[in-house]
């Protein structure tokens, strides 16, 4: 079981379904949601408040990331998150897995260029596939 998961997806229904699947399967108890990459960066950057509120659940151990979102898409998030990982030790922990409806091979290749991206899954979420990726 992962300590916590951050789901970055602009679709409220997808967020709800992913959260439900993660918690009901016993994968995690705590799921954080962000509607886009910008919102997620703000959340991840606020260490003091989040650590005080969520204790051992912050920072999340896993980030599930969509590609197509407003304000800051998944690839823009990765660029900013890469810098955040270098600046803040606690951000070096989370594993990123893309969870998207995109079947574009160029997107897969682009995502896997980041060393902290460990997988690329297609919606809907397959918990067994996610467990395989996270366990490696």
Where are the regions a protein language model picked out?
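Receiver (REC) domain active-site loop signature in two-component systems and cognate sites
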Residues: 69
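A Lys-centered signature of the CheY-like receiver
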Residues: 122-123
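Helix N-cap/capping motif at the beta->alpha junctions
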Residues: 33-47, 74
């Amino acid at each position: 079981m992962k300590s916590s998961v951050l789901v970055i997806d602009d679709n409220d229904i997808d967020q709800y379904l992913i959260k439900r699947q993660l918690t009901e399967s016993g994968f995690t108890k705590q799921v954080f949601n962000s509607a886009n990459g910008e919102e997620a960066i703000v959340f991840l950057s606020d260490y003091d408040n989040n650590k005080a509120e969520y204790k051992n659940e912050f920072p999340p151990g896993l980030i599930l990331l969509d590609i197509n979102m407003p304000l800051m898409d998944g690839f823009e998030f990765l660029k900013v998150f890469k810098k955040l990982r270098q600046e803040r030790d606690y951000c070096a922990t989370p594993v990123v897995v893309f969870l998207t409806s995109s079947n574009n091979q160029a997107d897969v290749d682009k995502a896997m260029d980041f060393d902290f991206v460990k997988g690329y899954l297609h919606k809907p979420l397959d918990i067994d596939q996610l467990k395989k990726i996270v366990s490696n």
